[in-house]
Design a protein with these regions (language model features):
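Beta-rich accessory regions
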Residues: 1-116
Length: 116
């Protein structure tokens, strides 16, 4: 469930709810969290999402919780299967705290958000 709005700088911002009840071990029905706020842009007919400039200082190039593989990547502590990304990964940025990891591939061309 995403909320989209136009901010005072004219940016289109998306914040999404990431539900957690489908993950193993969660027993409460209200588990989840909000995503990192993303600026949404249309570039060459494709929608991109990238963290707003106010939180970009939190982005990293690597993370011990993410294992890169030849066919994509796997997020540790996630009960999901490996993510298969078809195409060359030119740029990979990661933001993580104790509850969520968000992976931005190729400047926000693809985004993967996982509760940990």
């Amino acid at each position: 469930a995403g909320q989209v709005f136009l901010d005072h700088k004219g940016r289109t911002i998306l914040i999404s709810w990431l539900p957690g009840w489908q993950y193993a071990g969660y027993k409460k029905k209200d588990i989840g969290c909000m995503s990192v706020p993303r600026e949404i842009k249309l570039i060459d007919g494709k929608i991109y999402g990238y963290p707003v400039e106010e939180v970009q200082h939190l982005l990293k190039d690597s993370d011990s919780g993410l294992i890169r593989k030849s066919y994509g990547f796997k997020i540790k502590r996630s009960h999901r299967k490996s993510v298969v990304y078809k195409g060359e990964i030119k740029d990979l940025k990661i933001i993580r705290d104790g509850y969520i990891m968000e992976v931005f591939v190729n400047g926000g061309e693809e985004i993967y958000s996982v509760l940990l």
